[in-house]
Amino acid sequence: MRTSETHPIEVGWLPDLWPGRVGLTFAPGKHQPGGLSGAWVRDLELDLKRLRTVHGAQHLVCLLEDHELVKLAIADLAQRAKSNGLEFHRLPIQDGSIPAELGAVRALAQRICSWAAARQTAVIHCMGGLGRAGTIGGCVLRTAGLDAPATFEALREARGVKCPETNEQRLYVQQFTAVAAAH
């Protein structure tokens, strides 16, 4: 079983393209008895404190849907993040899928780049920190000017070979700047 004590929350950092930092992680505080990587019983308070104090996070970007927050026993994530000094932002995306609203993704990616340019630290999370977090992290890198191969290499270095997880997510990241510019 993975807990906040046995497996402290870590962040996979994207390349240093800005004075600030942007990273990817799994859902803080999650309770997931049948997770693919084993059982998770985490402490939300410990995870949020570690994100703030050890990793220097100022912004927490949550990509989970409402039902996932309930299922993972972190329905109060927004309030708890704020009480730990984190600015909380959300863009719910269906698990294993791509974002429904291109405009919302473009705006979020630009905001994250702006925060990092202003020496702030943002941490993006989904359930496991690979699929949806990797997709949005990839869009941030594409917005910052990286080409698709460099973006995928940076995501692999940050979170591993399955980041983003699906072909649909990888294609979304690959085509993001061209599609965003056309709209």
List where the protein language model places each region:
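Conserved G/P- and acidic residue-centered "switch" motifs that form tight phosphate/ATP-binding loops
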Residues: G129
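Cys-dependent protein tyrosine phosphatase-like superfamily
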Residues: M1-V123, I136-H183
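Short cysteine clusters
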Residues: C126
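Ser/Thr-glycine-rich phosphate-binding loops at phosphate-binding pockets of nucleotides
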Residues: A133
